[in-house]
Amino acid sequence: MSHSVPNALMTGADYLDSLRDGRQVYLNGERVADVTRHRAFRNACRSIAGLYDGLHGEQRDVLTRVDAQGRRSHRFFTPAQNAEDLLGAREAIGCWSRMTYGFMGRTPDYKAAFMSGLEAGAGFYGDYRHNACAWHRAFADRGLFLNHAIINPPLDRSKAIHEMRDVFVHVERETDQGIVVSGAKMLATGSAITNATFVAPVASAQMEAGKAEDFAVVFFARMDNPGLRLMCRPSYEERASSPFDYPLSSRFDENDSVLLFDKALIPWEDVLVYRDLRRATGFYAESGFANLYNFQSGIRLGVKLELMIGLLSLGVRANGTQSFRGIQAALGELIALQHLLQALTTAMARDPERNAAGSAVPRLEYANALRIQVPQIWKRVRELLESALGGAPLVTVSGAADLRDGEARRLVDSYYRGAELEPEQRLKLFKLIWDATGSEFGARHAVYESHYSGNAEQIRLDSLAWASRRGHLAYCEAMVQRCMADYDIHGWLRGPWQHD
C-alpha cells in the first residue's frame, strides 16, 4: 500500500532549485549570487541533493514511511509512537549518514529532532500553536532542510542578555505583518544551503523578567528574508585543489556562518514564541529535542567511526605494522568505541520514554550518557589514529598533479609504495586519512564533535540537573542510606550477616 501513496518530498533537483531564492550570503567580501553554482558551496549542495534523491530511489522504503495521516515522509520527520518506529528511524538516519560517511553533522534529519514533534506538541505554543502545526506539515511533507542558530555572539559574557541589545537578536517592534528583529545569532552551521533557520535563545539563557522580554522570541527565518544576511567563514570546499587531495573537504564542508538580522520582518505565521520568558527556553524540555538530537548525532557518529576503523586498518596495513601488538590494541579499542555508540543508540530506540505530547522518544538518561561520551570518543579516535599511524599521513605528494607528470610520477612510483599498496593507492589512502583528521576540515570536525552539544561543563551540569529532577540522584543517595542502615557501632542490624 505504501508504494501507492504520493511522494511530495523534494528531489535533489527540487532542493537545489529551492536555494535559488536571492538569499544574501557573503563570502570573501562578495555576495554569492547562487550557492548551488558557487565553488565554495556547490559540492555540499550536491551532497545534500543526493540525500533527497535517496528518498525516491532504491532506499525509499528504508528512508521513508507513511504516517497516520497518509503522508509519506522521512522516518525521522514525524513523531514515533513506539520502539519499532524509533528503530526504523535509526535505520533511516544511518542510511543517510552513510551517503556522507558521517562527515555532515547537520543534514536535514538533524533538525528533525525538534521539528518531528512540533505538531503533536503544538499546544505548548499557545496562541502560536497553529504556526507550529503548519510548519511541521510543510517540513514533513516536503522534507524541508532546516538548521538552527541559538547562540549569542560571545562578546562580553559578564553582561546580562538585555544589556547587549546592540548585538543580540531582539524584537524592535511589531506590526500587523509580524515582528521586526535585529541582532546576530550563531553558529549557523550549513545555513547558507538550508531552506530556513530556527532561531531561539539557548536552553541555559538567563533572561530577567521585566527586562529581557524582547529577547524571548522563537521563530523561523526563511533564508530569502530581505533583512537577513549570512557572513560565512572561509570555505574548505573552495580551497580544495582536487578530490584526490581533499576527498572530504571538497564535498562535505558545512560552512558555518553568523546570521545578521537588520530590521528583518518575521511574518506572524513564522513565530512560535513572542516575548514569553518561560516558553522561550521551555520548549527544549517539552519537545524532546535533547532526547532526539543526541539519537541522530550518535547514529551519525557511529557511521563516521565505521569509516575511521577502515582507515586505521588499511593505514597500518599500508605501513606494514598490522601485526604489532600495540597497533592491534588501538584498532580493537576503536572498534569497541563504535560498538559503544551502536549499543547506546540501540538502547535509546528499544527502551523509549514519552515526551509531553505522548510521543515515543529515546530515554533522556541514555541520550545524556551519549552526549557526554561523544566529545571524548572523537578525541580518542584522533589519538588512536595519530599514535598508530605516526607521520605517515604527512608522507604524501603536494597534489594529484605530481601523479600526472611523467618525471614526478617516476619518482613517486619508486619511493612512495606501501607494504600492500601501489604508490597511487597509498597516497590516495593517506590523503583521505589526513583530510579526516589533520586538514583544516579535519580540525574543524574535532571542534564540532567536541562542542556542538554544549560546552564540557554545561553538559555535565545538565546531567546533574536531570538526575536531580527525575529522582535518580535521590535514589542513589537512598541506596547509601540503606547500606549504612545494615550496621552500626555494635555490629550488623539486619540481613544475612546477622549471626549468633
Curated annotation (Swiss-Prot):
InterPro entries: Acyl-CoA_Oxase/DH_mid-dom_sf (IPR046373), AcylCo_DH-like_C (IPR036250), AcylCoA_DH/oxidase_NM_dom_sf (IPR009100), HpaB/PvcC (IPR024677), HpaB/PvcC/4-BUDH (IPR004925), HpaB/PvcC/4-BUDH_C (IPR024719), HpaB/PvcC/4-BUDH_N (IPR024674). Disulfide bonds: none annotated. SUPFAM superfamilies: Acyl-CoA dehydrogenase C-terminal domain-like, Acyl-CoA dehydrogenase NM domain-like. Keywords: FAD, Flavoprotein, Oxidoreductase. One of its GO terms (molecular function) is oxidoreductase activity, acting on the CH-CH group of donors. It comes from the Bacteria. Pathway: Siderophore biosynthesis; pyoverdin biosynthesis. Its cofactor is FAD. The keyword Oxidoreductase applies. GO terms for biological process: pyoverdine biosynthetic process. This is Pyoverdin chromophore biosynthetic protein PvcC. The lineage of its organism: Bacteria, Pseudomonadati, Pseudomonadota, Gammaproteobacteria, Pseudomonadales.
